[in-house]
Amino acid sequence: MTIPRIRQPRAVIDRKALTVVLEDLAATVTDNRERRARLLAVLKGALGDGRAEVRRRFLEEKGTGAAVFAENSHLMDQIIRLLFDFTTTHVYPRANRTIGEQMTVLAVGGYGRGEMSPQSDVDLLFLLPYKATPLHEQVVEYMLYTLWDMGLKVGHATRSIEECIRQARGDLTIRTAMLETRYLWGDRALYGQLKTKFWTGVVTGTGPDFVEAKLAERDERHLRMGDSRYVLEPNIKDGKGGLRDLHTLLWIARYIYGVSDMRELVELGVLSADAATKFGRARAFLWTVRCHLHYLADRPEERLTFDVQPAIAARMGYTDRNSGRGVERFMKHYFLMAKTVGDLTRIFCAVLEDQQKRRPILSIATLLMRKRNLGDFVLDGGRLAVAGRGAFREHPLQLISLFKVAHDHGLDIHPDTLRLVTEHLPTVTLLRNDAKANALFMEILTSRKDPELALRQLSESGVLARFIPDFGRVTAQMQFDMYHVYTTDEHTIRAIGLLHRLETGALRDRMPAAADAVHKVQSRRALYLAVLLHDIAKGRGGDHSILGAEVAMRLGPRLGMSEEETETVAWLVRHHLDMSRTAFKRDLDDIKTILDFTGLVQSVERLHLLLALTTVDILAVGPAVWNNWKSSLLRELYTHSKDVLTSGFQAEARDKRVAHKREELAAALADWPQASRERYLDLHYPAYWLTFDSATHLRHARMLRRARDAGLTVAVEVLPDPERAVSEVLVATDDHPGLFSKIAGAMALAGVNILDAKITTMSDGGALDIFTVQTLEGHAIEKEERIARLAKTVRDVLTGDLPLEKALRRQPPRLPERTRHLTVPPRVIVDNQASKTHTVIEINGRDRPGFLYAVTRALTDVAVQISSARVSTYGERVVDSFYVKDVFGMKIVHRAKLAQIREALEAAITQTVPRKVEEGAEQGAEKADAGEIVAA
């Protein structure tokens, strides 16, 4: 292997001049310790100067990663050569070396490939003809200690030729390393002997074994790294679609074909010229990104974490545009390159598998398969293939039917056929208005056999983006936040697979309501198409739900949907966020919430469809997003809405319902003295009786009596509810302004998240506040010591024994430091239409310790009473919804008061002086109704 020639190499390091310096040093300094110190200073200075020049060229002259790799490799080569010559000539000189004392220094690994990034290790192999002699040991030790003292990380091995061959036969890692050795200095003939023996004694006849082992190694690495190239913070080296996948291609190509560059495979007919060009572009892009990453982190960092993504995007020229943020455009380019690597890896490795892996004995299943009707296709080695190279040109429909037949029969597609698909992608555009092609696609999408794999194959091959260009626009599209784990296309395909699992009952334990609802759906085709299209318009600079509905209206007829089906799909896409917004942000005990939602849905069929779509949409966001609490909220909204849609709203008189609830509790408290019972019933206002069920009323009554009997001024009880993965915290004390905010602050100190809160006041001036909480990890609080600690923290804060403000300032950040670049525009929405009795205030901001305390204290400071709250967290973004009244118990309607509230809340969200921001950001879903104030 050789490295490319670099521009003005002596500006990086001048070995000739340094040789003169070292010769003079050896001649004038006789003390060994002093001489070594001076040698170290010279080499360390040369290394530092060289690295600075390489960095300057890269950053100031907009250089490439390829140039950095070549320049760093050249720099290190000269350092090694200078050190070797000085060591063997002046430190351990030997006039007449025997054959057994010869030595060669080889570069190995990334250094051997000439891919030396700014923070790469230096991997060396000291090659000997026979067993190591004392001279060898002295030279190697002197060189290694000098390199270590220079601050280099050196991986090293000292082996004879026979040791190299023996170990390469038995160890795949060593065998792979031997593939990319590069001569540095010493006896060149020795290296020639090693190469000859390696290729004849190790490689010959072992190609199939090597291919199998490297592909298995690749698969294991993918599983270890998450098995997806579409993750928020990808590993550029070891992640799927990263540099290690390209290395795998190179290793196999070199092992099987003896090539050192992928372009040589074009001449051999293994790779197309276009594929070789794509390989080069992907590698060059990843090299450049990796160099920026190493320079920014100043360490061998391989993950594109949130904190470096914006900086790298800016350095590589990705600026913000109307169509999206620069960092999102950069990451989209990264994911597209990772996809390209995946495409190349799949096709090339499949070709090699087909050529090199031992062919399996034909099973009975395969023999029977040959008798099945595969249409226009044939089996080649057990894989589905076209009948001839002109098949797609003569019959373009086969570009779709290929995937349908493979899906129906559970067959892999032959690599040569996949390569032909890639070559004929422009032909797919001719199929967009072909009725048969659209019908075939809908059969794949709605297949009773899991359609996820077929859709993924259509996407990976590039066919899906050509067939539905709107899908191509969201391919590799990411959102720069912690909530959306996958790119839009990956999220969508996962959602389709989850919908299939929901239908089969595989998810029934986690989401029973949705599993029941999906089987009651009449418009199954509409549901699957709605899932495919629900995020189709993301990244277009407007409300993606509205824009997506327009796409659905256009695509539906093309895909063979009836007018009714098309309207259903468009409605689902338009409203695919409304069910989760209502369930997670609104008070489900407020009948107007239910009536407004059912007024939107209008039919049980649409309710079933929307629940199924909402469920798989949330599940497909990421593995940690769904939880039992969200499941219970959606189930509650679904159940209440279904009751209204099937039976109608029973507008029983308010007084009658209150009286009925009081009578039920009175009966349950039969063991209480009558006077005590009546006194307790009179404590609560009508709203309390209508908010909770009878079992909850009884639990509250017994808790308040225990507190009174114990003479407690502050009573706290924690009730775990593992089934919903939450705990209920009851707090009883005297009512006073700021009570809610103090409890919220105490919860933050105790390390729990508030999900829901109900604030009730009593006629004797007492307060009973009910909080639904989780641990920061999303679990119920069940351990006794954790329960006791939470209760004590709340009590100590309310009694004044624990100074709240001071304690909150000591709280560590909620989010990792690397996420500091993830900003959330402060947003305050005041809605006077959502409830008949309350003003609803929704707040969006960046999560931090004490966030809920800060905003509730701000509400207290402007004389706003909180009746209930709902808290949701989406990665770094927190959304709090409050049902509030003014000091007179009325909705807040005056513009001046609303403006005061907005300014106070905005200051609390940002922890800065309130500032006016432009309204109408697309991130905020709802628009202001009449009388609401929005701070975007």
Swiss-Prot record:
Uridylyltransferase (UTase) activity is inhibited by glutamine, while glutamine activates uridylyl-removing (UR) activity. Residues 373-727 are annotated as: Uridylyl-removing. InterPro entries: ACT-like_dom_sf, ACT_dom, HD/PDEase_dom, HD_domain, NT_sf, PII_UdlTrfase/GS_AdlTrfase, Polymerase_NTP_transf_dom, UTase/UR. Has four distinct domains: an N-terminal nucleotidyltransferase (NT) domain responsible for UTase activity, a central HD domain that encodes UR activity, and two C-terminal ACT domains that seem to have a role in glutamine sensing. Its EC number is 2.7.7.59, 3.1.4.-. Modifies, by uridylylation and deuridylylation, the PII regulatory proteins (GlnB and homologs), in response to the nitrogen status of the cell that GlnD senses through the glutamine level. Under low glutamine levels, catalyzes the conversion of the PII proteins and UTP to PII-UMP and PPi, while under higher glutamine levels, GlnD hydrolyzes PII-UMP to PII and UMP (deuridylylation). Thus, controls uridylylation state and activity of the PII proteins, and plays an important role in the regulation of nitrogen fixation and metabolism. It catalyses: [protein-PII]-L-tyrosine + UTP = [protein-PII]-uridylyl-L-tyrosine + diphosphate; [protein-PII]-uridylyl-L-tyrosine + H2O = [protein-PII]-L-tyrosine + UMP + H(+). Residues 1-372 are annotated as: Uridylyltransferase. This is Bifunctional uridylyltransferase/uridylyl-removing enzyme. It comes from the Bacteria. GO terms for biological process: nitrogen catabolite regulation of transcription; nitrogen fixation; positive regulation of DNA-templated transcription; protein uridylylation. Residues 915-936 are annotated as: Disordered. It comes from Rhodospirillum rubrum (strain ATCC 11170 / ATH 1.1.1 / DSM 467 / LMG 4362 / NCIMB 8255 / S1). Belongs to the GlnD family.
